Amino acid sequence: MYRIDQWVTYCQFPDAQSENLRKGKRAVILDRLSNNRYEIYIDDPEMDDKWRRKIVNAENLKPID
């Protein structure tokens, strides 16, 4: 379980064949939702702002040590 303001790695396609699709992006937890889902903000200046905020499943997140 992740906490609000915790930094994580977000991987949209963790089981993809391509390394580029499996590569994670740094994100911060904004909110904890029901059904093991989280609202995150992706720290990627190359992404348009409208795509940086997402609701994702916990299995797409990994903690940053």
What are the roles of these predicted feature ranges?
Residues 3-65:
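Basic/aromatic-rich interaction segments and small domains that mediate binding to polyanionic partners
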